Every structure is written in C-alpha cells, then in structure tokens.
Amino acid sequence: FEAQLENLFFVTNSVAGRCGPDKVMWDLEELWSSGVRAILSVNDGESVHISRLKAIGFAYEHIPLSSNAPVQSGDFEVCLDALPRIIKFIEQNETQGKVVVHCKSGKDRTGLALAAYLLKSKGFGVEESMSAVKDVRDIAFSAPDWDWFTEKVLVGLSNT
C-alpha cells in the first residue's frame, strides 16, 4: 500500500491531505488497508463515489470550501462557516484511524482545512499551523491570494 501513502502528506500521525481522485485516482481498498478510516472532501466531491466509500466502511463527509483564486467577496464567510464542521469531522474520526482531507490539487483548500485543524485542535498559532502544512506540502497556499487569505481566515477562526 506504499503507493497509496506516497500521495498523502501527514500533518499528524493520523491526519493527512491529498489531491482529489479527479486529479490522481485513488485505490480505496488500499487506503483502507493502510489504516485510512475517514475521507473528507472540501471541494465539490468530483469523482468521489460515495456509495463505494460507504460500502467499504469509510466515514465520509462533503464540506466545501471556497475555490476562488483570486479570492472573491463572500469567500471569507464561506470558509469561516465551514471550518468548524471540518475540524469536528477530523476530531470525531482521527481516533478510529487515519483521516484524509482532499480538494482537487490538495494544496489550498486542503491546506486551509489542515491548518485550521492544527490551530483549533492542536493549539498551533496561525503562522505555525501554516508552516506545518507547508513543511509537508510545499505548494500549499500557492494559488493567487491564498497566502494572505488563509492567514486572514485562520486569524478569524482563532477569534471564535
């Protein structure tokens, strides 16, 4: 199952990001056998076959984050609204096994979700959480505006 794990980047022992199956197809049986028990789509869930996920036994949730780059009006609120639910899903499932968060490219929306989890669940600071994600995924927050936008959202989240 090493081939499946090489597409994952872990921010903790049990929480990882990945690009979506619409970009690099995944083998769900291999992900399951490597200990993944939950999958979270933070994009539109393109190419995710929910019935197959459920049949294998994965916990699955679809909580979209804004995909605009450059950022548009309303994106801040969309992300601030979705992130507490994203963090809750990760926290509820990380005790059962590995949790994989994905969008399409696995860098901006996924990076924001993982940084928010580190911020609220692990007590990281805003810059520390962004750095931790970039340490394992150097192209994180590289879409137009997503560097300052991620920081702005995390600051907003840290005040909730």
Regions found by a protein language model. Give the residues of each.
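Cys-dependent protein tyrosine phosphatase-like superfamily
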Residues: 1-100, 105, 112-160
